[in-house]
Amino acid sequence: MQTTDPTGIFNRNKLSEEFSNVLPDEARLKLDAILLEIQTDFPEICYSLEYLNTKFRSFLTPQSTCGQKLESLFQAAAELTTAEAPKWEFIAARLLYFQFSFHLKQEETRRELSDFYKKLVYLTRQNLYGSYILEHYSREELLLAETYLKAERNNLFTFSGLDLLLKRYVIRTHDHIPLESPQEMFLGIALHLAMNEKNDRMLWVKKFYDMLSRLEVTMATPTLSNARKPYHQLSSCFIDTVPDSLEGIYRSIDNFAQVSKFGGGMGMYFGKVRASGSNIRGFEGAAGGVIRWIRLVNDTAVAVDQLGMRQGAVAVYLDVWHRDLPEFLQLRTNNGDDRMKAHDVFPAVCYPDLFWKMAKEDMDQNWYLMCPHEIFQAKGYHLEDYFGEEWERRYLDCVQDARISKRTVTLKDIIRLVLRSAAETGTPFTFNRDTVNRMNPNGHAGMIYCSNLCTEIAQNMQAIEEVSKEVQTTDGDTVVVTVTRPGEFVVCNLASLSLGHLPVTDTSYMEEIVSTAVRALDNVIDLNFYPTPYAKLTNQKYRSIGLGVSGYHHMLAKHGIIWESEEHLKFADTVFETINYAAILASTNLAEEKESYSLFNGSDWQSGAYFEKRDYHSEKWLALQKKVAAQGMRNAYLLAVAPTSSTSTVSYTH
């Protein structure tokens, strides 16, 4: 299609004139400058303003207000986006930002917020910003931070990314009026994450801001949403081990409610809970099984809906040898007894290697389902506390023990149930427990039973245990004091490297950006508002972080790498080895600067087994292994490739 206005002057003037009577002169001149900038930055004929002008006018009516005209302008650009002309999405973002900044400026003027410091004071008084920012930074430091703002980085957004960011992440008043720009959001997050830095604090503020505003690294949604705010729950993932007791089960459900209240997702391991028909205090057939408890979890997920924003999210895990497995595999299917359904949870199954080994040999072999409580009564141990060859030996021993009741099914029947559920509901998720525990760098300190909601976290777990309840008198009042052992309530803090925006072949740059991201995530541990004290204790014990990636396909496309090629495999190995090396280097350097996590001694990090298990034998890796053994590690767990459905949209990387 050939344009009739090659210079664009006519159409730029026509678009600008449409706002001559509805926009102040300053805003109209700014709009004209943006249109000129669009012409300069997108000179191809398919991005001619003639197309924008024509589409824009098709939306107008004689009654169109200023706000409707501004909305029509960016909607027109968005609708021009096609596979042949994809950059209209960037043009639409610039026009959307013009509309947003126009209204933001009006609100700032009305409230006399003439600089960043005054805005923070106002937001703090309105309880929209946490008071800790003003308590930790001086006015001079905050005005210096304002100079870091780079408005031109708004041009990195696409329309869909900017639209999502403005709707979900920027701070709004209690009546939903936005009072924060995207760049101020990134700066506010950076100020929060650098708050406790003792040396070169403002340098770290700038580094964190640059990393985020260039869209090179995205923090997880809880961090983007809640950093800088009064209730700064910054973690994404939590995992709890549900104990086999009435008090313990309800405590786990309460913990899930607290996590969901502040926007976290949850994984819950039900493999310790006795099966349906098992005994309670010697009364045979009294136990209702795991399904009834999972239904309570389901109702909690629906009820605790994060201030009406979205319902809670939870994955429930069960071992493939648990006697309630057949009913568990039908939790979300549409047929069967609705009293045995839980449609709002995500079931997941934990498999030992033996299951797959037997299935490969002969799927008609029998598989035995047992109750963990009956196993403990008969054998004196918890089968789920073992993995690998030791688990196989004990499982086969339990199979031969006539004191333990069993449900006998064929492997084929179990796999058929799994596939039927997967086809109908997309679940159950899969967790290969032996593989995970073999590679666990902290196996000396515990056991991993399951993963989290999104199945990317694997850390040591332990059920919370009640020790005692005592009646005491405190300040003249009678109180009941409950003493509990905190167990290990897993929590992880996430961020993702935007591979499509990074020079992944530049090793020094990657080491620098990974080091900055690791430091930011490590700071989250100390700055976080924890929904439960158990989460805080575990996070401070292990200092686990989850640095992941997004934009994998984006990266391959940028480098012209074909998916089904040997080059792809080699390239992926190189990129992820670079990331892993840089993350370990950053963590050991942090350990030297601060200190190691408390359970470093005896870990695979200290012994070098971590490197041996992964065949890291090059000179570079051997040097790092020695460095880690000498300096320690700041974080027990480092990498986790988490889903990034929202943040990858914001950062425009796929």
Where do the PLM segments sit?
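Extended catalytic cores of very large enzyme megasubunits
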Residues: 1-652
